[in-house]
C-alpha cells in the first residue's frame, strides 16, 4: 500500500469518527433556534415587565418634587411595553422592525458560534490525522532502523565466521597448491544421452524437482542400465526393492561417476547413501584391476560418518556390492575396513596385512589408525562426507583438517546431507574443485511423505500418553529422546507394560547397540527407544511411526528424526510432544516447517507471536495450510537454515560459540 493511499485511509477513519459529532452539534443548534422562536415572545414580555418593575421602584424612591416628570416617564414606559407586547403577538410580517432586528442578531450569533465549532472540529480532525501520520511514520522509521541494525549485526557475525581457514590440508596451504580441474575418469554417459539438447536435460530435472548449480553439469540419467552400472549391482538393488534411481541418484550418480566434486542435498530417505558409495566401489574395483594392492597400501576411497551406527550401515551396503561383484561378476574381492570405536583392532589385523581398498569410519578411530601408522592415504583419491554439516560444524572442524592433512594427492570430495545451511555450503566449497551442487527440495525441508502431528503434552503426562500414541500404527515404532535417562526410563516402562522394546544411547557398549538395532531390524522387537545417535542416516525401511518424546534442541535434528519414516516413497507418521519447556525460537522453527510442508499447525504454535515476514506471508497466502513461497520472501538463518529466527538469535550459533565441552558432551562417544 502506498503512503498516499494509507494517509487517505487514516483521514477517512478520522472523518467518520467526527461526522456523528458534527451532526449532533447541528441538531443542537436547530433545536436551540426552534426553542428560541417559541420562547422569544415570552422572554421579551418578561424582560419588559422586569424593566417596568425596576422603573416603578426607582420612581417611588424619587422625591415628589419631580412628580410631574415621573408620572410622564412612567406613562411613556408603560405605553412602550404595551406596544412591544402587542407587537409580539402579531404575525412576523407585521412585527416592528426593532423586534425583528433583535431576533436577527440572536440567530446570527448562533450561526457564528456554529461556524466556530465546525472550524474547531476540522482543525482537530486535521491535527489528529497529522498526529496519526507522524506516529505511523515514526513507527516505520523505527522499524527500518531496527532492520538495518540487525542486518549490520548479522554482517559482522558472517565476517567473523569467514575468518576460518579454508577446508584444505596444511601441505596444500604451505605449498600454495590450488587445483583448477576435476579428476578425470573413464566413465562416459551413453552417446545418445550426450547428444541431447540441454533443454531436454533441464526438462528431466524440472520433472523430478532437481535443482543444480555449477559449470558443465553432466546430464541426468533415469535408469541404472544407462549409467553402465554392473549387472550384479543392479541385481542387489532389485533385491532391496530399488528398481529405478531416485531424483538425487538420477543427477548425483552421473556427476560423481564423471569425477566431479559434489554437494548433495536431499530429504531424508531419498537414497543419498547409494550416490556416494556405489561410485567408490566402482572406482576401487577399477584401480584394483589396474594394479592390485599389497600389504600396507590403500585405501582408494574413504567415507566419514558422524556415528558408529551410520558407519556400520554404510559398511554393510558397500559389502553387499563388493560381495555381489565377486561372487556373481567374477571380479576381485574388495576389502572394506570399518573403523569405529568399540571394535577390537586385533580382529582387523588380517585386513591390514592384505591391504585395504575402502574405509568407512568415524573421525576418532580413523585418526587413531593414522597416528599408529596402520593406514595411509597415498593412494586415496576419493573422500565422501556423510551428514557433512555435522562433520564440518565448529566442534569437528579440527578432526576433518587432521584427516585432510594426510592426503598427498588431489582427491574427489563429496558432501551429502539432508540439512546443509548456506554458510556451511560456502565453507565446504573451500575444499572442492569446480563443484556441482545437486539439490532435491529445499535444504532443511521436511520429507513430504511424513504426516507430522504435534501435540501439547504436559511433562508429567508424557510417559503415560506414550502408550496411547503407540496404538496409532502397527509396529515397528521408533521413539526419540533428548536425554539418556529418559531412554532408560521409557524402556523400563514399556517392558513393564509387556511391550517388546530395545534401547540404544551413547553409554551402551558397541555390542549392545549393534544387537539392539539388529533385533529391531529383523522384527524381533517392536519398539526402539534411542537418543539422536539413531537419527542420523540410519535406514529402517518398514518404520511407519516415529515418536519424538521431546523436541530436540535444534530443528535440523527434528528433520533427521522424522526422516526415519516415510522412506523410499512410503508414507509415515511422526508424533511430537511439545510443552512450555521448549524455547520460543525452536517452536517458531517448527511452526515454519509445518506450514511449509502443508501440515496442521496446533493452536499452541499459532498463539506464539512472531514478526517473521516469511511466516506471515505464508499464512496470509495459504490460510495456515502451507504451500511454499519463494526463498526471496525472507532471509533464513544463514548458520542453521532455520526460518523461525534470524542469525543474531540463532540458538545453535550461541551454543557452539561457548566452550567446546558443551557440544562434545553429547554423543562424543561416537567419535
Swiss-Prot record:
Q: Where is this motif: Q motif?
A: 222-250
Q: What is its main location?
A: nucleus
Pfam families referenced in this protein's UniProt entry, alphabetically: DEAD (PF00270), Helicase_C (PF00271)
Instruction: Please name the GO terms that the record assigns under molecular function.
Output: ATP binding; ATP hydrolysis activity; mRNA binding; RNA helicase activity; zinc ion binding
Catalytic activity annotated for this protein? ATP + H2O = ADP + phosphate + H(+)
Residue ranges annotated as coiled coil are 19-43, 100-154
Keyword Nucleus in the entry? The reply is yes
Know the name of this protein? Probable ATP-dependent RNA helicase ddx41
What organism is this sequence from? Dictyostelium discoideum (Social amoeba)
Gene this chain is encoded by: ddx41
Amino acid at each position: 500500500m502506498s503512503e498516499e493511499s494509507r494517509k487517505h485511509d487514516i483521514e477517512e477513519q478520522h472523518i467518520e469518527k467526527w461526522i456523528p459529532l458534527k451532526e449532533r452539534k447541528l441538531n443542537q443548534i436547530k433545536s436551540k433556534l426552534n426553542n428560541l422562536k417559541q420562547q422569544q415572545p415570552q422572554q421579551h414580555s418578561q424582560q419588559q415587565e422586569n424593566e417596568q418593575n425596576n422603573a416603578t421602584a426607582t420612581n417611588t424612591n424619587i422625591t415628589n418634587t419631580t412628580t410631574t416628570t415621573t408620572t410622564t416617564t412612567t406613562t411613556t414606559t408603560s405605553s412602550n411595553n404595551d406596544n412591544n407586547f402587542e407587537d409580539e403577538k402579531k404575525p412576523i410580517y407585521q412585527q416592528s422592525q426593532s423586534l425583528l432586528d433583535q431576533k436577527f442578531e440572536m440567530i446570527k450569533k448562533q450561526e457564528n458560534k456554529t461556524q466556530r465549532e465546525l472550524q474547531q472540529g476540522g482543525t482537530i480532525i486535521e491535527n489528529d490525522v497529522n498526529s496519526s501520520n507522524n506516529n505511523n511514520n515514526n513507527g516505520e522509521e523505527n522499524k527500518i532502523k531496527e532492520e538495518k541494525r540487525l542486518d549490520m549485526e548479522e554482517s559482522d557475525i558472517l565476517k567473523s565466521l569467514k575468518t576460518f581457514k579454508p577446508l584444505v590440508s596444511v601441505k596444500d596451504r604451505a605449498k600454495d597448491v590450488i587445483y583448477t580441474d576435476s579428476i578425470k575418469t573413464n566413465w562416459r554417459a551413453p552417446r545418445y544421452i550426450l547428444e541431447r539438447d540441454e533443454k531436454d536435460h533441464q526438462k528431466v530435472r524440472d520433472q523430478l524437482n532437481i535443482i543444480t548449480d555449477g559449470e558443465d553439469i553432466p546430464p541426468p540419467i533415469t535408469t541404472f542400465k544407462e549409467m553402465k552400472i554392473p549387472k550384479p549391482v543392479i541385481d542387489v538393488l532389485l533385491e532391496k526393492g530399488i528398481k529405478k534411481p531416485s531424483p538425487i541418484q538420477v543427477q548425483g550418480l552421473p556427476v560423481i561417476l564423471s569425477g566431479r566434486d559434489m554437494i548433495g542435498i536431499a530429504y531424508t530417505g531419498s537414497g543419498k547413501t547409494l550416490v556416494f558409495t556405489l561410485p567408490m566401489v566402482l572406482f576401487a574395483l577399477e584401480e584394483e584391476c589396474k594394479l592390485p594392492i599389497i600389504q600396507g597400501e590403500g585405501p582408494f576411497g574413504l567415507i566419514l560418518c558422524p556415528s558408529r551406527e551410520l558407519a556400520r550401515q554404510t559398511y554393510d551396503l558397500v559389502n553387499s556390492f563388493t560381495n555381489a561383484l565377486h561372487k556373481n561378476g567374477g571380479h576381485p574381492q574388495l576389502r572394506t575396513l570399518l573403523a569405529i570405536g568399540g571394535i577390537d583392532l586385533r580382529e582387523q589385523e588380517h585386513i591390514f596385512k592384505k591391504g585395504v581398498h575402502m574405509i568407512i569410519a568415524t573421525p576418532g578411530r580413523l585418526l587413531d589408525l593414522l597416528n599408529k601408522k596402520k593406514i595411509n592415504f597415498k593412494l586415496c583419491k576419493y573422500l565422501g562426507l556423510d551428514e557433512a554439516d555435522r562433520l564440518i560444524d565448529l566442534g569437528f572442524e579440527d578432526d576433518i583438517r587432521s584427516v585432510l592433512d594426510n592426503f598427498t594427492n588431489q582427491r574427489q570430495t563429496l558432501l551429502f546431507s539432508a540439512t546443509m545451511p548456506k554458510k556451511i555450503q560456502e565453507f565446504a566449497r573451500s575444499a572442492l574443485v569446480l563443484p556441482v551442487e545437486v539439490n532435491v527440495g529445499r535444504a532443511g525441508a521436511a520429507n513430504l511423505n511424513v504426516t507430522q502431528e504435534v501435540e501439547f503434552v504436559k511433562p508429567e503426562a508424557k510417559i503415560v500418553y506414550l502408550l496411547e500414541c503407540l496404538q496409532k500404527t502397527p509396529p515397528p515404532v521408533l521413539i526419540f529422546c533428548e536425554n539418556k535417562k529418559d531412554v532408560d526410563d521409557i524402556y523400563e516402562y514399556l517392558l513393564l507394560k509387556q511391550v517388546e522394546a530395545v534401547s540404544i544411547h551413547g553409554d551402551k557398549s558397541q555390542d549392545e547397540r549393534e544387537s539392539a538395532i539388529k533385533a529391531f531390524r529383523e522384527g524381533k522387537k517392536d519398539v526402539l527407544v534411542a537418543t539422536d545417535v539413531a537419527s542420523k542416516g540410519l535406514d529402517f525401511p518398514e518404520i511407519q511411526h516415529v515418536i519424538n518424546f521431546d523436541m530436540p534442541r535444534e530443528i535440523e535434528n527434528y528433520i533427521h528424526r522424522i526422516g526415519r519414516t516415510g522412506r523410499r516413497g512410503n508414507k509415515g507418521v511422526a508424533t511430537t510432544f511439545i510443552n512450555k519447556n521448549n524455547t520460543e525460537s525452536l517452536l517458531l522453527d517448527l511452526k515454519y516447517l509445518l506450514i511449509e510442508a502443508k501440515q496442521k499447525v496446533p493452536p499452541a504454535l499459532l498463539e506464539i507471536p512472531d514478526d517473521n515476514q516469511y511466516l506471515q506471508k505464508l499464512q496470509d497466502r495459504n490460510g495456515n495450510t502451507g504451500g511454499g513461497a519463494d526463498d526471496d520472501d525472507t532471509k533464513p538463518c544463514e548458520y542453521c537454515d532455520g526460518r523461525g529466527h534470524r542469525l543474531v538469535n540463532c540458538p545453535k550459533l550461541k551454543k557452539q560459540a561457548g566452550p567446546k565441552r558443551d557440544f562434545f558432551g553429547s554423543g562424543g562417544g561416537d567419535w
